Structure formats: C-alpha cells, structure tokens
Amino acid sequence: MTRMQESADLLKCSFCGKSQKQVKKLIAGGGVYICDECIELCNEIIEEELNSSAAEAKDNGDRLPRPSQISAFLDKYVIGQDDAKRILSVAVYNHYKRVRAEESRTTHKRASEEETELQKSNILMLGPTGSGKTYLAQTLARLLDVPFAIADATSLTEAGYVGEDVENILLKLLQAADFDVQRAQRGIIYVDEVDKISRKSDNPSITRDVSGEGVQQALLKILEGTVASIPPQGGRKHPNQDFIQLDTSNILFIVAGAFAGLEKVIEERRGKKGIGFGAELTTKADTDAVDVFRDVLPEDLVKFGLIPEFIGRLPIVATVNNLDQASLVKVLTEPRNSLVKQYQRLFDMDRVDLEFDPEALQAIADLAIDRGTGARGLRAIMEELLVPVMYDIPDREDVAVVRINEAAVRGLQEPEMILHSQKDEEEKTA
C-alpha cells in the first residue's frame, strides 16, 4: 500500500511539476504527463493567438478607408456637396472605427471600467429634393461593402396602429444582408422624409399623433442601440411566431428630409423677421445667397416639430444645397455612371452614336430646375426626349448618329438623325 502511494506521488505533470494529488486530472502519454490546468492554459494561449492572427489578417485585408479616401470616392459619383461629403466622410470613418474597437474589445475580452466608451453618432441630413441625399448614402454603403436599406418615414406608424412598425426597417436591412445577422449589424439604414413625421402641433391634443411624434418615440430605441425582435416574414408581431434578434448598437442611421419651412424658423430665430421701421428687409437673392440650413440649431428643429430626444440621437448634421445649372450639367456628364454615358451605351448597342450639344445639356438642367425636381428629375427628362428616337432606331440600320440640340430639348424640333452616308460626307469635308 505504501509503495502504491509513493508511486502515485511520483506521477507529476511534465509541464508545471504538480503531483497527481494536486490536480483534478493527470493525462499520461509516451512517458510524459499533463494536468488539466496546463491543458486549460494551452487552450487559452492558442485561442488568443488565433484571434490575434485573425484580427491582424482582417486589418491588413480590410482596412478602413480614411476620410480623404471616402470623400474622393464620393467625388467620382456625386457632384458638388463638398461640405456634406466632408462631414459624412469623417462621421462614417469614426463610426466604423468605433465598431471595430467594440469588436476587438469583445473578442479579446478586455472590457475595462477605465476604458473610454465610444457612443454612436447617427447623422441628420437636411436639403431639398433631388440634391443627392439618398445617393450619397447609397454610395457610402457601396464603398464600405455593408448592407444598405432605405425606409420611408411616412409609411411608419406607432406600434398597434395600421401601417408599418419601425422594426420593418430592420427587416429590410436583414433582407439586404441575406439574413446574415452579423453582417446586418454593421449596416447602414437610410430613413427618408423624416420631416414628414414632425409633431402636428406644439399643443397637446386629445387625439394621438401615431404617424408623427409616435413614430419619433418608436425610433428612439433603435437609433440609440437595442436588441430588437424582428419577425422574419414582416408584418405585425404575434406571440406564436419566431423572431430574429438584431442588435442595432453598431448600425449607422442616416436620417434625412427636405425640411421645407425650416428656413423660416431659422430666420425668425436669427432676428431676420420683424415689423415696423426697424425690421430688416431681405430679398429673394439674399435668401438664395445664404444657406440658412447651415445655421440650424436643435431649438430650430424642436420648433419645426422634432422631439428633443429624437434630435439628441442625431448629433451630426450635414446640409446639402440645391444644384444649380452648372452642377446639374456635371451630374449629366461627369460621374462614372452619368446619365449621358448610360444612354450613349444603350445607343451604342444598336451601333448608333449619341451626341449632345453643350446648349442641349444646359436646357435639360434648366428644365429640372424649373420643375423643382433637381438631379432626381434628370432621368425623366432624358426619357421624354429619347424614347421616340429609341423606338425608331432598332428599325433604322442607316442611322449612324443621333444629335441632340437645344431646340430638340425645348420641343421645337425632333432630334437630328445623321445617316451613314451623311456622316461619311462630313468626315471627307472635314
């Protein structure tokens, strides 16, 4: 018995030297022994090294673009709006730096009470229709390769009323991410027409404002960050259905609207409105010259109809301006996927060249300005102009060039069709 005890005492872990009695388990193999404590320590070391290697590989292969690179990418697709591009570039860069810091902290389990916690900063965009708000957000998502969803605030209602729940916004993001929850939790959600959900009145009412203040209240939690329960099929929730849990803490929300009438609120606050001999007179030219949205303060937005809690969750404000004629002409011609290049490509498939006179492009821009549709209305104008030609061209093998001049845009004449024989003569005389 004594010999057996001595032999048990002689069995020791080959790594830490502890005897069999000092550990829970001692595993033997090939003349060596290892205890359960050393096995656990080895597992921790291996896991830490694997996580470190994975994080390093991700950083090397998936570097976050710098603000200057983000802005340069936006320049390729979006004309003008330099101030908005700068603000958005910095905001998006800081947001995804924060996301990566949170992921790194979670992976390495280094959450410390002394470590500074970075709060999420969502974005509010102010600007007229057709100025590029939606396109800026779409282009950002394409650059960052993250899921992107667009929601219309006017279709939302408070939970329990006819209309869409705010959770349906998150469902759209999940669908854009092919129901990959981890990927969706790093996405971007663009909520348009948010000015339409302003409070109907500052005065309390006996009727509930389910599509105004009620929607703002419902949006608060998902803007700030919460774990939302999403019905996979959409629609209203009911107790006997499965839900997908989605954490909105790292989802970037870009909330936008035209905010028509906000400029009057800002001007009143700045003291530009008054009565009597001391009142300051302003002309339309003065109003056009000054971008009053740049001077917007939270108190102006509250007076417009947004609740203070909602404004507080949108600390970054970017303003976009109306596009003038020169900017709209650039929108037509300069971006990689400009409308002129797209239609030229369509005509090229029928072996026909499409040409625009400079005056024709200016006339198209003027029409968009007159209609008040901005860049968004350019495609409709181009369609109206080119559909009759695109109808005839496939049946006309003799046409070499379609030339658009100002008179054609104004509807004073048909677009000019140049035949192959005429083109050959022009080239000979040239």
From Swiss-Prot:
Which residues hold ATP? Answer: 128-135
Q: Does the record carry Cytoplasm as a key word? A: no
Q: At which positions is Zn(2+) bound?
A: 13, 16, 35, 38
CDD domains, sorted: RecA-like_ClpX
**What are the protein's UniProt keywords?**
ATP-binding, Chaperone, Metal-binding, Nucleotide-binding, Zinc
Q: What does this protein do?
A: ATP-dependent specificity component of the Clp protease. It directs the protease to specific substrates. Can perform chaperone functions in the absence of ClpP.
Q: Could you identify this protein by its name?
A: ATP-dependent Clp protease ATP-binding subunit ClpX
Q: Which organism is it from?
A: Corynebacterium diphtheriae (strain ATCC 700971 / NCTC 13129 / Biotype gravis)
Gene name, Swiss-Prot/TrEMBL: clpX
